[in-house]
């Protein structure tokens, strides 16, 4: 096609499908000119990105101009400025279909940029997790604003008794709350509002009804899959009473729920709660109700018993569904690291406010300083977490699928090796196995005491 494209940098098993992709990409209008305009380093990186990620390869077929996005906005600061522009455009879209299109185009291009930096090795794991979380935050803010634009002409603004506007509060939970979102993840959200009242438009409705309409429309803008794809799958099950509860609840109802019905597992969940919208309105409830619910004033060693119960439930599910190769739920997986950190947060967080933090990576170094773990254990857990999150993202980058299980097809194991930046799957597998052994040993020590924990294998510690 008159433009050099180097296949030799990718494993042999991936060269034939990559060559077919290159032929097809070259047929797309503008692709070769955009490719030729790339700096040398991006041209050198593209073969591994397209070989490791069918998602990235498909984006470049569908949207060749995404190459220019990567070229112009590749570095994090440049990307933040460009993302802010997309957020403004999507938020001000007067027609829902336009908002949907802009959000999906934005997501497609920014996810390509994030995958490209990750696979090429230019982004550390922490950068990738933060970039994914910032993209989700921006899409949520834009979708909320766009949904509001559709409602305002009919209903006006939701107001309290004094006529002041009442905001929607959106909490990010789970990995989104900790700003550590994985590549193809659901986003766990909770919708709240601060005060009852009525809207001030031509058709007056109660604030609760307004926010339920707004919440449904927000979810639809993000979650619906159409010819442009989707933005984020939205999971609302962490709200009070789960699927049986209202979509949007008042702060007063949340306060009552936590006091009367809050369960131990919900304390773990609410560690992660972070206000994406409506932070000022949420802050008093967090200080007076959520924080005391999560973090007790006394040393709370009872959380270990509840942790054992939760782990037993997960272990039964892993066995039933044959999830031994599950990076999240399997033995020594990501969930066990989260449990270790969160258990220590719940035990000591009431007396040590530094531990009141939704980020695993930010809390881990504090554990050694709080004498909750040795410096070597913290270093081991941190390394294991980064290995497992790199592998998890690598699996999901293959096809933008929400999976946490290691592939079984040889070609996908090679793709995962590319995405992890290792020479071959033997190296990648050994690295994952070593990380899981380290995690399992420490998790056993937390649950049952060091004497009952599995012995650490010498070779496991070498990874």
Residue ranges of each PLM-predicted region?
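A nucleotide- and high-energy phosphate-metabolite-utilizing enzyme signature
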Residues: 1-463
